[in-house]
From Swiss-Prot:
SMART domains: TPR. GO terms for biological process: cilium assembly; protein localization to cilium. It comes from Giardia intestinalis (strain ATCC 50803 / WB clone C6). InterPro entries: TPR-like_helical_dom_sf, TPR_rpt. Residues 405-425 are annotated as: Disordered. This is BBSome complex member BBS4 homolog. Belongs to the BBS4 family. Keywords: Cell projection, Cilium, Flagellum, Repeat, TPR repeat. TPR repeats lie at residues 28-61, 63-95, 130-163, 164-197, 251-284, 285-318, 320-351, 353-383.
Length: 425
């Protein structure tokens, strides 16, 4: 029977069996099974054709409509997902929970968060699983409802303390809120959960690609939270993340390794990592930033400027704009430096604003320096050292402005005396 072959995971044999069966006649169930096997082989377009043909033979079979909606979702055809799900929801007094879940996910992808939230909550009410609740939490996070998302994720953790994905998602929410201690706890718990699962296996070899997708981010995220304070331990976490992933093609691991080696003053290793990240994804802003950062540390400002220059047109690449401003200033391009550092300062980067103040103090451009000093007072310092430098720079600016004013006043008095002397003569 084709269906038995499908459930056994023998998809090619299942399709061969269906081809034989079709010679004796095509049925709704046969086409449905064909669609399942084709989708399992990632032949999505062919699967859609089979499900549509099955649907024509029996338009009232909900299971075929749901499978068709799944295919459209995998294809990214979200309007069709909504159409299929709505056809079930509108004709059923109590529609299957999966119809609401798919409807909610498709609505979210199309930017209709109100409809997404409505249908995901309906799905959860009909079928209250941890996965459904996690989807609600992710939706809340994407909608900017961080506190609601954190509460939802914590509810899941209370019921399932070792849910690796949820712990990672919760940790990332805390990172966005700059609650790094809470993030560290979440990522640490995720790593412990991973280690427990690995300990249950006969070796460190992972059984499925999905395992590495889940396990690797736990170590990566933990490394991220500690790399500023403990780069050596962070390096170990990144190495584990890379080994669990099974390949070396994750550009973001390489980019983060760059900063670890910079912290360890190993610029040669940092350059290797940054170059690798850039080669893997040259359009990624974090990868460009990592390579530009290393070139600045090496004093190669021309290359840094070249790598970082796309940040000029990016409205949110504040850290890259900060670095680009430094490179521009070192190359004598003070106008470009002012534009870049101003953008970064407007983005809330205290360090970028401080850099602008220091650069234009050194250039004796007190007017521009004063503009950065005004902005600096509005921002929260990112660390005690930058706060100390900021106060010292503002104090120096005041002194220079006073000296300049005194000089101007002295010149004015001197000119007035000369005029009086000329008149007396």
């Amino acid at each position: 029977m084709p269906l038995n072959l499908y459930y056994a995971g023998l998809y090619e044999q299942c399709l061969s069996s269906i081809a034989v069966e079709k010679k004796r006649g095509t049925t709704h169930q046969l086409l449905h099974t064909e669609g399942l096997a084709l989708r399992a082989l990632n032949r999505i377009s062919e699967a859609i054709s089979s499900f549509l043909a099955s649907q024509k033979l029996d338009p009232f079979d909900q299971s075929t409509t749901l499978e068709l909606a799944k295919c459209f979702y995998l294809q990214g055809n979200y309007p069709s997902v909504i159409a299929q799900c709505d056809s079930i929801i509108s004709t059923e007094g109590r529609a299957p929970w999966l119809a609401h879940q798919l409807r909610g996910l498709a609505s979210f992808r199309m930017g209709d968060r109100h409809a997404a939230e409505k249908h995901l909550f309906l799905a959860y009410d009909l079928h209250p699983t941890l996965q459904a609740k996690q989807l609600i939490g992710e939706l809340q996070a994407a909608a900017g409802k961080s506190q609601e998302a954190i509460a939802t994720m914590n509810d899941i953790i209370a019921l399932s303390p070792e849910s690796i994905n949820v712990l990672i998602e919760l940790g990332l929410l805390y990172v966005k809120l700059n609650s790094l201690d809470d993030a560290f706890e979440c990522f640490s718990r995720a790593v412990i959960a991973v280690q427990k699962q690995l300990a249950c296996r006969s070796s460190m070899t992972l059984s499925t690609p999905q395992d590495s997708f889940i396990f690797s981010p736990a170590f990566f995220s933990l490394g991220y939270t500690i790399q500023a304070k403990d780069p050596r331990t962070a390096l170990l976490k990144y190495r584990v993340a890379a080994s669990l992933k099974g390949d070396s093609k994750d550009p973001h691991i390489w980019a983060n390794l760059t900063y670890v080696f910079v912290s360890l003053s190993n610029l040669e290793a940092a350059l290797v990592c940054a170059t690798r990240a850039f080669q893997l994804n040259s359009t990624s802003e974090p990868c460009r930033r990592a390579l530009g950062h290393v070139y600045i540390c090496l004093g190669d400002y021309c290359r840094a400027f070249q790598i970082l220059s796309p940040a000029m047109g990016d409205t949110r690449a504040y850290e890259s704009q900060w670095l680009l401003g430094i490179a521009a200033a070192k190359l004598g391009e003070l106008r470009i430096a002012m534009v870049c550092l101003s953008k970064a300062a407007d983005g809330g980067l205290y360090a970028a604003c401080l850099t602008g103040l220091l650069i234009f103090l050194q250039a004796n451009d007190l007017t521009t320096a004063a503009q950065f000093s005004v902005k600096l007072k509005e921002l929260d310092p990112d660390n005690d050292e930058n706060l100390r430098q900021g106060k010292a720079a503002i104090k120096r600016l005041r002194k220079l402005v006073q000296e300049e004013n005194s000089t101007v006043e002295g010149q004015a008095v001197s000119e007035k005396n000369e005029q009086l002397t000329t008149t007396d003569g």
